[in-house]
Design a protein with these regions (language model features):
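A short acidic/basic microdomain associated with nuclease active sites
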Residues: 1-2
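Conserved catalytic cores of phosphodiester-cleaving nucleases, focusing on short active-site segments
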Residues: 8-31, 35-36, 40
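Short secondary-structure boundary micro-motifs
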Residues: 9, 53-54
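Short, surface-exposed, polar/charged, turn-prone segments marking secondary-structure boundaries
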Residues: 23, 39-41, 47-51, 83-88
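Short, charged, amphipathic alpha-helix that recurs within catalytic cores of restriction-modification
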Residues: 31-46, 56-60
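Domain-level recognition of nuclease-like catalytic cores that cleave nucleotide substrates
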Residues: 54-99
Length: 99
């Protein structure tokens, strides 16, 4: 991106939004910090998407309910994966934050 490189686990782009997705086997608090750094780098290095909302998403197989609450407070989507079930967690009052 503009001569700068960094790795994203996954990126989804729609007409009016971008979703930066971190995929982890075990969620750790540092994963949120990493996601936020990736969002900032993406915003700086993709002027073609400057008018799009940017959302953060973390996907993990190993997590606890406190992780879901913490991410919800930050406005970050959380998706869990177990066996053959994929679930988007949106606790009551969840408001996704757009960067």
């Amino acid at each position: 991106l503009n001569g700068n490189t960094f790795e994203l686990d996954m990126l989804a782009v729609s007409e009016d939004a971008c979703y930066i997705i971190e995929i982890k086997s075990k969620y750790r608090k540092d994963d949120l910090k990493q996601l936020l750094k990736h969002i900032e780098k993406y915003k700086i290095n993709t002027p073609e998407h400057k008018n799009k909302k940017i959302f953060g998403v973390i996907v993990a197989t190993d997590f606890n309910k406190e992780n879901i609450k913490e991410l919800a407070k930050k406005g970050v989507y959380f998706i869990s994966v177990s066996d053959d079930i994929i679930k988007l967690h949106q606790p009551e009052g969840f408001n996704p934050f757009a960067w």
